[in-house]
From Swiss-Prot:
Binding residues for heme b b566: 97, 196
InterPro entries: Cyt_b/b6_C, Cyt_b/b6_C_sf, Cyt_b/b6_N, Cytb/b6-like_sf, Cytochrome_b, Cytochrome_b_C_euk/bac, Cytochrome_b_N_euk/bac, Di-haem_cyt_TM
Chief localisation class: mitochondrion
Gene3D superfamilies: Cytochrome Bc1 Complex, Chain C
Lineage: Eukaryota, Metazoa, Chordata, Craniata, Vertebrata
Biological processes per GO annotation: mitochondrial electron transport, ubiquinol to cytochrome c
Similarity remark: Belongs to the cytochrome b family.
Positions of a ubiquinone binding: 201
Name used for this protein in its record: Cytochrome b
PANTHER family: CYTOCHROME B
């Protein structure tokens, strides 16, 4: 008799995705972040569901309802901080996952990569709308500043912003619709993640060498299931350390002040994971130019496969590209730092230089380095 897990219509899908899946024998811990992102998404959906049971999406009661969750609901503080810091862990895993893809040439799986870019945009949109919900000062002003960027779109800009706001400013209508979108988007993300996996399993995983690994495959279970469990335990350890010892480390103190449209905070800034994009936005003095640079800073990922000029897939054997990759990482860290600084003299010029370097590295220097390395292979 054949095993039920190989014949049952539903079990068969699970079996071919997580048990009998042929996986390269040499994938490193950088391949753990896909499963960690899945775990993050599950944590966010579960904690978010319990928060939604007690939250009210009304401008008069939103802030108080979050306070009520933290003070009066059983373990409400834990659920709230797991959700807030879970978002930070989500983005850490996302950035490492994308970085891995860039380093090892995983972007050559075009469908998987492009769905990944769509997923990145969806997660960023979800996180932005979630940040508005507690209705603190930074929630309100962050929503005002970021939605206002759409007014830079010629001709339809102003109408578009007022349509999104549901009025002439960020108000009750905005908060209610942001809550609705924030609730539905994670389920769309989960569906997209399923499609992401579907396309990945059409080709099989990439590996650190970038070479075809068909001749040397091992079953996903038990080798990578146990490896993923270790990754999950480390993720949960870091998350719990954050939540239980310094839950407000990554947050903004301004968000503990209820939203007040009459009082603008001295420094409006988004959560830490958007600071690099915010720095790129601010480094261009023109509004439309800034918005275009902001969108392009993420959308540039979609054209990375077209910029691949190397004869090798991975950067494992390409020292010049490796150097440029780590310069890019350092540049993004500098942009993140600049995004959190006030707009004044040394920070403005540093931000502008870092923004130029970001696009220069991806569009010019890395493709050129790959061509150079191709020529070295001829010697």
């Amino acid at each position: 008799m054949t095993n039920l897990r190989k014949t049952h219509p539903l079990m068969k899908i699970i079996n071919n995705s997580f048990i009998d899946l042929p996986a390269p024998s040499n994938i490193s811990s950088w391949w753990n972040f896909g499963s960690l992102l899945g775990v993050c998404l599950i944590i966010q959906i579960l904690t978010g569901l319990f928060l939604a049971m007690h939250y009210t999406s009304d401008t008069l009661t939103a802030f108080s309802s979050v306070t009520h969750i933290c003070r009066d609901v059983n373990y409400g503080w834990l659920i709230r901080y797991l959700h807030a810091n879970g978002a930070s862990m989500f983005f850490i895993c996302l950035f490492l996952h994308v970085g891995r893809g860039l380093y090892y040439g995983s972007y050559m799986f075009m469908e998987t990569w492009n769905i990944g870019v769509v997923l990145l945009f969806a997660v960023m949109a979800t996180a932005f709308m979630g940040y508005v919900l507690p209705w603190g000062q930074m929630s309100f002003w962050g929503a005002t500043v970021i939605t206002n960027l759409l007014s830079a779109i010629p001709y339809i800009g102003t109408d578009l912003v007022e349509w999104i706001w549901g009025g002439f400013s960020v108000d009750k209508a905005t908060l209610t619709r942001f809550f609705a979108f924030h609730f539905i988007l994670p389920f769309i993300i989960a569906a997209l993640a399923g499609v992401h996996l579907l396309f990945l399993h059409e080709t099989g995983s990439n590996n650190p060498s970038g070479l075809v690994s068909d001749a040397d495959k091992i079953p996903f279970h038990p080798y990578y299931t146990i490896k993923d469990i270790l990754g999950v335990l480390i993720l949960l350890l870091v998350l719990m350390l954050l939540v239980l010892f310094s839950p407000d480390l990554l947050g903004d103190p301004d968000n503990y002040t209820p939203a007040n449209p009459l009082n603008t905070p001295p420094h409006i800034k988004p959560e830490w994971y958007f600071l690099f994009a915010y720095a790129i936005l601010r480094s261009i003095p023109n509004k439309l130019g800034g918005v275009l640079a902001l969108v392009m800073s993420i959308l540039i990922l979609a054209i990375i496969p077209m910029l691949h000029t190397s004869k090798q897939r991975s950067m494992m054997f390409r020292p010049i590209s490796q150097c440029l990759f780590w310069i890019l990482v350092a540049d993004l860290l500098i942009l993140t730092w600049i995004g959190g600084q006030p707009v004044e003299h040394p920070f403005i010029i540093i931000g502008q230089l870092a923004s130029v370097l970001y696009f220069l590295l991806i569009l010019v220097l890395m493709p050129l380095a790959s061509i150079m390395e191709n020529n070295f292979l001829k010697w």
